[in-house]
């Protein structure tokens, strides 16, 4: 046999790897053809062929985690649906039934003390209604005649009967004998019978006209019924004033020369007679103007 000098090219390892990858990629069959020729120098090459073997692909268990994931997602969806249903049901009940109002907090006992009693009225204040003293329009002057002042109180008490109606509570305790004088004005029994018997029928008209007519009719009726009773009421007031408030002349005893009139008081003879009658007050000597001008300072003081 004659050996050929030519040698076959060697197969690189990268080429073999690429072929292996291609064979593994297919799923139907896998075929491998390898030829190896190893000859030293002058030797010929031999080819070795491998038989095609059908390899069975083993099925990997990759579906179990996917199925488990699907089951987990389904359970999560069911939980979400049930939670939404419960939430919607609770919202509907809240809209239908209003929430109950909380009870008010209990108030502590004895927290607020009662208001203090009003202070007693000041007896020295001019606003006190019980101090209803009337002063005369004219001053007393040098006459100091308290008898005229007492007469003024008796005459002016009739005019102040209307103002004393506001102090009915205090005056009723002071004057229990005549409560109708100092109480609020009320129509007498004769006035009530007259109004019930002789009240005319007022014409039916508007409210304004009715008010005018009724006021005029009441004023006329009051004038007719109250005027005859003014005099006895004034007499009763004077009697009560004399009983409760005694005259100043009875309480305070003044000398006779203070109760005299102005003409008698300031008469020169009356003054000299009065002062001469008392031993402690001798009458003063009268001096002429010429004598006063002629006197010196030392003589005047002596």
Swiss-Prot record:
Which stretches does the entry tag as region Disordered? 32-65, 86-125, 155-210
Query: Bias regions of kind Basic residues — which residues?
Result: 51-62
Q: Does the keyword Nucleus apply?
A: yes
State where composition is biased (Low complexity): 155-173, 191-200
- Induction line: Induced by oxidative and abiotic stresses such as hydrogen peroxide H(2)O(2), cadmium chlorure CdCl(2), and osmotic stress induced by mannitol or salt. Seems not activated by heat and cold.
Question: What does the UniProt entry say about where the protein is found?
Answer: Nucleus
In the record, biological process GO terms are:
regulation of response to oxidative stress; response to cadmium ion; response to hydrogen peroxide; response to mannitol; response to molecule of fungal origin; response to osmotic stress; response to oxidative stress; response to paraquat
Assigned keywords, A-Z: Nucleus, Stress response
Effect of disrupting the coding gene:
High tolerance to several reactive oxygen species (ROS)-inducing agents such as paraquat (PQ), aminotriazole (AT), and the fungal Alternaria alternata f.sp. lycopersici toxin (AAL toxin); these phenotypes are probably due to higher basal levels of ROS and constant transcription of abiotic- and oxidative stress-related genes. Reduced sensitivity to drought stress.
Q: Which spans does this entry mark as compositional bias, Polar residues?
A: 201-210
Outline what the protein does.
Required to regulate responses to abiotic stress (drought) and to oxidative stress leading to cell death. Confers sensitivity to paraquat (PQ), to the catalase inhibitor aminotriazole (AT), and to the fungal Alternaria alternata f.sp. lycopersici toxin (AAL toxin).
Name-wise, this protein is Protein AAL-toxin resistant 7
What is the organism of origin for this protein?
A: Arabidopsis thaliana
Query: Which gene is this protein's source?
Result: ATR7
